[in-house]
Amino acid sequence: MGLQARLLGLLALVIAGKCTYNPEPDQRWMLPPGWVSLGRVDPEEELSLTFALKQRNLERLSELVQAVSDPSSPQYGKYLTLEDVAELVQPSPLTLLTVQKWLSAAGARNCDSVTTQDFLTCWLSVRQAELLLPGAEFHRYVGGPTKTHVIRSPHPYQLPQALAPHVDFVGGLHRFPPSSPRQRPEPQQVGTVSLHLGVTPSVLRQRYNLTAKDVGSGTTNNSQACAQFLEQYFHNSDLTEFMRLFGGSFTHQASVAKVVGKQGRGRAGIEASLDVEYLMSAGANISTWVYSSPGRHEAQEPFLQWLLLLSNESSLPHVHTVSYGDDEDSLSSIYIQRVNTEFMKAAARGLTLLFASGDTGAGCWSVSGRHKFRPSFPASSPYVTTVGGTSFKNPFLITDEVVDYISGGGFSNVFPRPPYQEEAVAQFLKSSSHLPPSSYFNASGRAYPDVAALSDGYWVVSNMVPIPWVSGTSASTPVFGGILSLINEHRILNGRPPLGFLNPRLYQQHGTGLFDVTHGCHESCLNEEVEGQGFCSGPGWDPVTGWGTPNFPALLKTLLNP
């Protein structure tokens, strides 16, 4: 049977739509705290929905990622282009035609694809969208720290059963923007303000052995990026003031090279300021991009829009740092698996993706009356490098580091343990004398974080005001990312490719070039069984601080060749 005949038969089933299915049956609906409904959306109002189309050759993609990321492979560093990835994963002609005809019949207009052809973003009226997706009912909600407006459906949606081989999920229906990361209150026991200097670029550079010469050369095409999903703005004026106060001892750039997305004139957010200021002071004098979500349409998911950008740009920064995270159990399995595939695509192209491990320790939730730890995603993805958090042993001195009790870490309930970390994790499980009860975590899951950096007590400039005591793994992540950008600078100057997906190499080196953090535990369930304690750090890798924090000269020596 020819493609045309198969398509006609399939379209008849799709349009009839009598047999339907829910592509995300395990997607939990819960209105986040602080959000309220403003009621149904006008049926004639237009909204934007994103359709994730089924991809092909994912096993082959996984093999290629392993080959280009493993230093022992002859293919190491021979990354794929965006066009190579597109040729590999793009949906079948039948999938493309079926979905396009289905959307066209429903009245969808202005459908935009990406280079890899595996996402379609279309505009429809609310009336059309609710007919297209039976069960969906679009409401407007407002909430979050900046009183963001979003359009979402509190009810599950259905698709024609005939589309099951062709569509993974539809984005823009259920998931809310992530909440703002927590900040510690200023400690009350500090007696003399002058004693508390806090973490600044000079403190970080001293602790991690960066000299004034450890900056970008300004002669390469090296670049780095941070992505924002918290409806926040950053201001270049804040960056200028931050560097005036804290960047006098090293060469740095005075402004961001490129903003992808809309950058408005509202008040700056602390999170946005933190990411930009510390990425650009750790990765000093390196061209920096910012992915900004403010100004997007109410029905779009900022994180999903960022993934679409990665699938549509052939030339991207080498290092991306991201502070976004959700509980694994709050997301549908098909959504998690598809996002993980997007990370795989990035790894094949030689991009280094760093995600914050989260600020709730091991996490905690109750399942059928039993407490369990609660892993985070994307921190638990096997295709990203996850960054945990530490504190100074003495908060007033530049000393060895200990666990920051909020540092996220644990074991995925979705992804199995990847081969690259098998030895390290098995050794931890065998040797740790402080393991929680086995019922609290999935010992065979992907374990995280992979590395760490200081996450406690940062100075940030936001709205031209210096703010102390900003904390969280959203601070440690851009710091580690900036240091990797400096290593990429040396690799590029030496004719080497950028580091790409770091984890296979990181675990092969068993922590060489990193300060091992061996003291402290992070938080978890406040019950009698574990009494608020999650996992504890120890020699080598652990699920609190990973392999440890960067010692720049040693890490550069380790990662410079091949």
From Swiss-Prot:
Names of the cofactor(s): Ca(2+)
Residue positions assigned to the propeptide: 20-194
Signal sequence residues: 1-19
Principal subcellular localization: other
SUPFAM superfamilies linked: Protease propeptides/inhibitors, Subtilisin-like
Active-site feature positions: 271, 275, 474
Alphabetized UniProt keyword annotations: Autocatalytic cleavage, Calcium, Disulfide bond, Glycoprotein, Hydrolase, Lysosome, Metal-binding, Protease, Serine protease, Signal, Zymogen
Organism: Mus musculus
Glycosylation sites: 209, 221, 285, 312, 442
Disulfide links within the chain: 111-122, 364-525, 521-536
Stated name of the protein: Tripeptidyl-peptidase 1
Gene Ontology CC annotation, any one: lysosome
Keyword match RNA-binding: no
GO biological process: bone resorption; epithelial cell differentiation; lysosomal protein catabolic process; lysosome organization; nervous system development; neuromuscular process controlling balance; peptide catabolic process; protein localization to chromosome, telomeric region
GO MF term (any one): serine-type peptidase activity
EC number, as in UniProt: 3.4.14.9
Cofactor annotation remark: Binds 1 Ca(2+) ion per subunit.
Assembly and binders: Monomer. Interacts with CLN5. Interacts with CLN3.
Positions that bind Ca(2+): 516-517, 538, 540, 542
